[in-house]
Curated annotation (Swiss-Prot):
Belongs to the D-alanine--D-alanine ligase family. It is found in: Cytoplasm. Cell wall formation. Binds 2 magnesium or manganese ions per subunit. It is an enzyme of class 6 (ligase). This is D-alanine--D-alanine ligase. GO terms for biological process: cell wall organization; peptidoglycan biosynthetic process; regulation of cell shape. The keyword Nucleotide-binding applies. One of its GO terms (molecular function) is D-alanine-D-alanine ligase activity. It comes from the Bacteria. Mg(2+) 2 binds at residues 311, 313.
């Protein structure tokens, strides 16, 4: 019997276009003999639409003809039923795969909605998604878990605006140059800047605060950028490691999604000891967040052989040139099998939750 799989994509986020690419790639990879696909598109304004197909080129995705007045996954009013009853068995959704990146999708908000609706969904739960999306909170969790990481500082917008000169001086004294300024709640390198001077630093703060009210500043680390995939629930497994080798100054949005001006080296050349350290730190990071389903863990490997965790991505991209699927492909897990495994993990975790008592 086929599994009815709802693909939620788009979203009210600066990473909207990345989500479109991910959704198209996943749709092409799905085995239609095993899955009935139900695309659910969230516009940039936050409107939910359901359509029959997601087969258009990415540039035309917004032009898809959605059914007028079709039942949406989320009603426009809370006075309506939170999840309208399907008119036929074909409309029932068994599992949701939220292919959303960034705020309003990857940050625990969508996961919370799906929890309330009691629908199995692929990926991390509310806690891991929220903490994994917020770089400030994530770094606090990693510090508590004893994971080595680069020096960093965090600022909120109002405090920064009240004492801009002091904030800039603090960055210079504690971190120095070069440093990286990032919105706390954003991915795909959106809003990130590399700074080599006070002028660049102030401009970078202004840019980052356009995307979030909190900003994290990290010291520049001289080293290789190494990534590893984690897959599973309570007994997670790791993929081979890959290396990001950008031809530009750093691995920004353009290098990731537009011109492809970056080499992905898979598997990366690391020693057995280095791999074990990366593997163990990735598993520890996953468990410290109470992860489920998947994460991609990103590290720095310094010239001295020190491994520093940079961040985890709780819903890594599935574009044709995204690192996470490629890591698992080189580990022996092809696209269709990877997606099937994620759906299976979603059902497994959902069934486990159903055994928890909710009355006293």
């Amino acid at each position: 019997m086929k599994i009815s799989l709802g693909l939620i994509y788009g979203g009210k986020s600066a990473e909207h276009n990345v989500s479109l690419q991910t959704a198209l790639a996943v749709t092409k990879a799905l085995n239609t003999e095993k899955f009935d696909i139900h695309p659910i598109y969230i516009t940039e304004e936050g409107e939910w639409l359901r359509g029959e197909k997601l087969t258009e080129p990415v540039s035309n995705v917004r032009m898809l003809q959605f059914e007028q007045n079709a039942k949406t996954f989320l009603p426009t009013s809370l006075n309506e039923s939170m999840f309208p009853q399907p008119t036929s068995a074909d409309e029932k959704i068994d599992v949701v795969f939220p292919l959303l990146h960034g705020p309003n999708g990857e940050d625990g908000t969508m996961q919370g909605l799906l929890e309330l609706l009691n629908i199995p969904y692929v990926g991390n739960g509310v806690l891991a998604s929220a903490a994994g999306m917020d770089k400030v909170m994530m770094k606090d969790v990693f510090a508590q878990a004893g994971l080595a990481q680069a020096k960093h500082l965090s600022f909120n917008k109002k405090d920064y605006e009240k004492a801009t000169p002091d904030s800039l001086e603090q960055v210079e004294q504690v971190l120095g140059y070069p440093c990286f300024v990032k919105p706390a709640n954003m991915g795909s390198s959106v809003g990130i800047s590399k700074c080599r001077s006070k002028e660049e630093l102030q401009t970078a703060f202004d840019l980052a605060f356009q995307y979030d009210r909190r900003v994290v500043v990290e010291e520049g680390v001289v080293g290789r950028e190494i990534e590893i995939g984690v897959l599973g629930n309570d007994e997670p497994k790791c993929s081979v490691v890959g290396e990001i080798a950008p031809k530009t100054d750093f691995y920004d949005y353009k290098a990731k999604y537009e011109d492809g001006d970056t080499d992905l080296i898979i598997p990366a050349s690391v020693s057995e000891d280095e791999y074990k350290t990366i593997h163990d730190m990735a598993i520890k990071a996953f468990k410290s967040l109470d992860g489920s389903g998947l994460v991609r863990a990103d590290f720095f490997l310094t010239e001295k052989g020190e491994v520093l965790i940079n961040e985890v991505n709780t819903m890594p991209g599935f574009t044709p040139f995204s690192m996470f699927p490629l890591l698992w492909k080189h580990t022996g897990v092809e696209y269709p099998e990877l997606i099937e495994k994620l759906v299976s993990l979603a059902i497994e975790r959902h069934q486990e939750k159903q055994t928890i008592k909710t009355t006293f």
